[in-house]
């Protein structure tokens, strides 16, 4: 190991680090970012950061080796060009939704695929997933379902009270 070049050791550490991140993530999405300005990428990073997601830009060789080490399949022939990986740590849909919104805003951003629940998802599946509201939106929908019957009962009681009061 003493004769190994420092750059090889560094690259192996990068592969190991990325493989650990991928194994511990809820989901991730791979996309080609060629054409995005630094301001666009910074805005995307901020959106991802607010949902406890991260954006990584690595060489395709390192990404492929990290995918192999993490047991990720489906991206073998898709890692060409300048790619970025948005990794979701908490909300499975947050990173996919953020990148899909950027891809709709800028035609030159190409989504290569996503990985969710240990399965590869193509662009059609990604569009379906991006249409699902985020965790907070789903919570608010659930809460409104619980409160709607109670609210209707209260409106009914108020109407009866107003009728008797007249």
UniProtKB/Swiss-Prot annotation:
Keywords: Ribonucleoprotein, Ribosomal protein, RNA-binding, rRNA-binding. One of its GO terms (molecular function) is structural constituent of ribosome. Gene3D superfamilies: 3.30.70.1730. One of its GO terms (biological process) is translation. CDD domains: Ribosomal_L10 (cd05797). One of its GO terms (cellular component) is large ribosomal subunit. Forms part of the ribosomal stalk, playing a central role in the interaction of the ribosome with GTP-bound translation factors. Part of the ribosomal stalk of the 50S ribosomal subunit. The N-terminus interacts with L11 and the large rRNA to form the base of the stalk. The C-terminus forms an elongated spine to which L12 dimers bind in a sequential fashion forming a multimeric L10(L12)X complex. Belongs to the universal ribosomal protein uL10 family. PANTHER family: 39S RIBOSOMAL PROTEIN L10, MITOCHONDRIAL. This is Large ribosomal subunit protein uL10. It comes from Ureaplasma urealyticum serovar 10 (strain ATCC 33699 / Western). The gene is rplJ.
